[in-house]
Amino acid sequence: MLLRMSNLFLRTLREDPADAEVPSHKLLVRGGFVRRTAPGVYSWLPLGKIVLENVAAVVREEMNRIGAQEVLLPALLPREYYEATGRWTEYGDTLFRLKDRKGADYLLGPTHEELFTLLVKGEYTSYKDYPVILYQIQEKFRDEARPRAGILRGREFHMKDSYSFDLDDEGLQRSYEAHRQAYIRIFDRLGLEYVIVKATSGAMGGSASEEFLAIAPTGEDTFVRSTGSDYAANVEAVVTPAPPERPIDGLPEARVHHTPNTPTIESLVEFLNNAGLGRTFTAADTLKNVMVKTRAPGEKEWELLGIGVPGDREVDMKRLEASLAPAEVALLDEEDFAKHPFLVRGYIGPGALQANKVRYLVDPRVVTGTAWVTGADKADHHVVDLVCGRDFTPDGTIEAAEVRDGDPAPDGKGTLYTARGIEIGHVFQLGRKYTDAFSLDALGPDGKPVRITMGSYGIGVSRVVAAIVEQSHDERGIIWPREVAPADVHVVGTGKGDQVEVALRISQELVDRGVRVLVDDRKGVSPGVKFTDAELLGVPTVLIVGRGLANGVVELRDRASGDRSEVSVDTVVDTIVNLVRG
């Protein structure tokens, strides 16, 4: 492959785009790899398309290695298949929905579990046909409310989605592990620093689920690791260790106190510590009750839900939404409070919730025998020593409180610390959610039907491109790993004398030896501009054909390390070939 910048469809930019927030967005646009078409929608230009296809090639190789077979299904999908599994409503506003001229409903596919299940159902009938793994690399669509960060969170994106079909759970476990190992090889080859974390399944359904997160401070996903073990989990999947229950006998009676002007935890704690109650109070002694409303998929009516968490914790809406998925969750508005006058803002307690049959879920730390300070359901009043299991009984527990550095690890080994990452892969053991919906059976060896079990596995191919840039760049530009770079070597002819002609000759010799070359043969462009573009574009090896040519030498630069060396023009082709081939 020989790309000549004199006729390459490429314009580099010196300034960051106005809407760019993260390095990958800035550099991919400045380098002419992508261009914004609409919010969350990007066009891939020649160099970007090459990088995208290089990532896809690595994914294909490793998927084929585990025996997966590539297919291509439509992106335009009929409503009825997604209605059969409930995802037409579960996905809510994130689905792109449309009608054809006859009024039939369609969607643009976010994932393809339904279609793959029906595809296999239409082709396979016997146990002898299984197991099978199918995959595709295709554009997906999600109507993100706030598309941001360039191609990191877009409305249209490239994704590899694969699906395994097995006769039993043991087979599913083997397929799941095969994918897990394939993903490890893929991300290792791509040079990414990543972590594998426990995750929730959300609208996908199923049981076991893990995410592959590229470690980056700009990532949208918060995950935790343990100081004492290899435990790692997405913050949404962290399970709070519950303390042991405590005896109730002998605990002080609950008493209501007049606590004027104390609608916040801070003001309440300050008041109590100056009220002469004979002990010191902290925010952790209080029980904060947060009101939300939930709505099941397809339902019109909202239901009230009370969430009780220790007062020194905030409610993490992502954790709350994950715990209640697939239901929709929203905070109460003025109209809601007006409709339910028993909800006294700033002073809500379990009493009014239970008296009015409002479901009440609490943090796992709220166990029988624990005493709390909480709202007395009356303005300017709180109750002290309200004991769980004696004075109130919650309807259950929920993971909704924020996770903090220093929290005990769920496995009992060490404490947690948080970091941020970019989700680049996700693997699910779906089980039989989709095969039940479409009655996907195989005729077993005994002549009886066997319900097939499924796995679902995704890699965000376009997001991987951005994740690589997030991890591999400097103040001058991108630093591509050789496996995905748009070229193996960037040859720069500085433009004086016969330097461009020699650069073109060396480039052709390299191409003849199987090296991918990007050559800057532009005339009328200063050496400084060419060097700046070479650093911005990030090809791992840069060859400068410049002033040293008069002495029979050229300069090799390593984009990552910055190392430079002079090489004889007569041996430079062999040197580069050996470098590229490792």
UniProtKB/Swiss-Prot annotation:
GO biological process, one term: prolyl-tRNA aminoacylation
One MF annotation (Gene Ontology) recorded for this entry: proline-tRNA ligase activity
Catalytic activity: tRNA(Pro) + L-proline + ATP = L-prolyl-tRNA(Pro) + AMP + diphosphate
EC number of the protein: 6.1.1.15
Gene3D superfamilies given in the database record: Anticodon-binding domain, Bira Bifunctional Protein, Domain 2
Enzyme class: ligase
Principal subcellular localisation of the protein: cytoplasm
Alphabetical keyword list: Aminoacyl-tRNA synthetase, ATP-binding, Cytoplasm, Ligase, Nucleotide-binding, Protein biosynthesis
Entry GO terms, CC: cytosol
Comment on protein domains: Consists of three domains: the N-terminal catalytic domain, the editing domain and the C-terminal anticodon-binding domain.
PANTHER family: MITOCHONDRIAL RIBOSOME PROTEIN L39/PROLYL-TRNA LIGASE FAMILY MEMBER (PTHR42753), PROLINE--TRNA LIGASE (PTHR42753:SF2)
Function: Catalyzes the attachment of proline to tRNA(Pro) in a two-step reaction: proline is first activated by ATP to form Pro-AMP and then transferred to the acceptor end of tRNA(Pro). As ProRS can inadvertently accommodate and process non-cognate amino acids such as alanine and cysteine, to avoid such errors it has two additional distinct editing activities against alanine. One activity is designated as 'pretransfer' editing and involves the tRNA(Pro)-independent hydrolysis of activated Ala-AMP.
NCBIfam families: PRK09194.1, proS_fam_II
Protein name: Proline--tRNA ligase
Native source species: Thermobifida fusca (strain YX)
